[in-house]
Amino acid sequence: MPRTQRNDNFIDKTFTVVADILLKVLPTSQREKQAFSYYRNGMSAQAEGEYAEALQNYYEAMRLEVDAYDRSYILYNIGLIHTSNGEHGRALEYYYQALERNPSLSSALNNIAVIYHYRGEQAIENGQSEISQILFEKAADYWKEAIRLAPTNYIEALNWLKMTGRLTGLAT
């Protein structure tokens, strides 16, 4: 089950060592330890661009993990992979599932907004201005919530909201 460390990144190696120590000393069940090991292996594979391997590890982690909060991060990372592969519809499904388990996951809200904004831009290119406005409004709603949860994390989104007059309903 342990993944060989192919990445020479000091931070990744340090994380792996610390995670291994924590797994040994924390009072967790064998199932929880296995779930975390799969999750960690998934993150390592994802960082190296090995998306198929990362997905396999994340699916195994999902099979074993029972904690909703921990599952939210697994689902979020699966969404990231689908986003990277241009599978935006599938990515949205996983981001929504992550938010069901962890409504404070601002990065999932941000990524949903980014996808809606991208789709809005595509609609403009296709001459569908009404659809683009609907998509931009959806993006704005998700960005406002992400900014509400993490006010300093999404400066570009905040600027876009200001420039497009969509800042209403957000205390800044």
From Swiss-Prot:
GO terms for biological process: photosystem I assembly. InterPro entries: PSI_Ycf3_assembly, TPR-like_helical_dom_sf, TPR_rpt. Pfam families: TPR_1. The keyword Thylakoid applies. TPR repeats lie at residues 35-68, 72-105, 120-153. SMART domains: TPR (SM00028). Keywords: Chloroplast, Membrane, Photosynthesis, Plastid, Repeat, Thylakoid, TPR repeat. It is found in: Plastid, Chloroplast thylakoid membrane. GO terms for cellular component: chloroplast thylakoid membrane; thylakoid. The keyword Zinc-finger does not apply. Its main location: plastid. It is a peripheral membrane protein. Belongs to the Ycf3 family. Essential for the assembly of the photosystem I (PSI) complex. May act as a chaperone-like factor to guide the assembly of the PSI subunits. NCBIfam families: PRK02603.1. HAMAP family: Ycf3. This is Photosystem I assembly protein Ycf3. It comes from Chlamydomonas reinhardtii (Chlamydomonas smithii). The lineage of its organism: Eukaryota, Viridiplantae, Chlorophyta, core chlorophytes, Chlorophyceae. The gene is ycf3.
